[in-house]
Design a protein with these regions (language model features):
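C-terminal, charged low-complexity interaction regions
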Residues: 167-209
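Long, charge-rich boundary regions
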Residues: 103-168
Length: 209
């Protein structure tokens, strides 16, 4: 097994273990997980698979030393006490949710720091004396920062499949943009459309269903 493990790899092993119950009804679930891990991924057992997958997750951790230190995952943006089992488990669940969406869609919503950087850059460009197109690009950066926060929220709620695409989200936000950048809103509406009434004025999160 040369490539880094994915969320889909682990799920495939779990699914095969369930199917193996028909061929090996005498084996407990743990033994069937071992068989599935060896058959699909060539590892010795499920414990080794789980250990390697945890290493894939942990590579993104920023873990300062010292008492009461808070670890921060630079991938899923989760902050937790790294020495607490419950926090470790909660981080893994959160990380796997983001990882699953990333693998399926090819898109990972930005972390808080990434979103704030996009918005800061966006406001600078949108308010600059540059060309209209450059200013529109700035507005789109702001919208991307808002979109990522909204999308992350939908992932946490298990509703990411229902969340609008970025293009649709822009159309939902045009009525709000009209109050912030009235000179840019018509161009955004022409490009993406204008859909009022879905996201409340002054809000930036798509309403969960």
């Amino acid at each position: 097994m040369q490539q880094a493990l994915t969320f889909a790899d682990v799920q495939s092993v779990k699914h095969l273990a369930k199917k193996l119950k028909q061929a090996h009804p005498e084996l407990p679930h743990g033994k069937r997980l071992n068989l599935a891990a060896a058959e699909l991924l060539g590892v010795r057992n499920y414990h080794e698979l789980n250990r390697r997958f945890q290493a894939v997750i942990d590579q993104y951790l920023d873990s300062p030393s010292g008492p009461n230190a808070v670890a921060h995952c630079l991938y899923c943006d989760f902050r937790f006490a790294a020495d607490l089992k419950g926090d470790q488990r909660e981080h893994r669940e959160n990380h796997e949710r983001i990882m699953e969406v990333h693998e399926i869609t090819g898109y990972r919503p930005g972390t808080y720091v990434e979103r704030e950087a996009m918005k800061t850059d966006g406001y600078t460009k949108a308010r600059s004396p540059g060309s209209l197109e450059d200013r529109i690009d700035g507005a789109l950066l702001i919208l991307r920062g808002w979109f990522d926060r909204s999308y992350h929220r939908a992932i946490d709620a298990g509703q990411w499949r229902k969340h609008p695409s970025f293009e649709t989200y822009v159309a939902l936000m045009v009525p709000y943009i009209e109050g912030i950048f009235p000179e840019l809103a018509p161009s955004l509406a022409q490009r993406y459309g204008r859909t009022p009434g879905v996201i409340a004025h002054g809000q930036t999160n798509w309403p969960l269903q």
